[in-house]
Swiss-Prot record:
Spans through the membrane: none
Enzyme Commission identifier(s): 3.1.-.-
Protein name per the record: Putative pre-16S rRNA nuclease
Domain of life: Bacteria
Species of the source: Yersinia enterocolitica serotype O:8 / biotype 1B (strain NCTC 13174 / 8081)
Protein's GO biological process: rRNA 5'-end processing
Keywords associated with the record: Cytoplasm, Hydrolase, Nuclease, Ribosome biogenesis
Function: Could be a nuclease involved in processing of the 5'-end of pre-16S rRNA.
Amino acid sequence: MANRTIVAFDFGTKSIGVAIGQEVTGTARALTSFKAQDGTPDWQKVEKLLKEWQPDLVVVGLPLNMDGTEQPLTARARRFANRLHGRFGVQIALQDERLSTVEARANLFDSGGYRALDKGSVDAASAVIILESWFDEQAG
């Protein structure tokens, strides 16, 4: 297994969560979340984050319906991933993110009750789940 640094994004139209992980350990942790204007982040903040962490790969969560079909937000997440690649030249992987927000909310509630459920924390925790599920798939 490679020792790559990987950043994951949980794309949303109002907020985008971010997590960081190491492929060699298969672990991830929440970094931050960015406000978004109708799905468009502050690209300067994204650039600063990518320069700081210098990931070898960026994983973007792909919001699918429960039956695996695409929804309008799926195309927007793909566009976000394409823009990340185009602007910053980073390698991109897309990862099914079904139920990641539900799982993130449950995990945060278990650790801190309702006070832990602010939007930024949920989005960053969702990015962790997206990255961990990507690690699990790579491990086979």
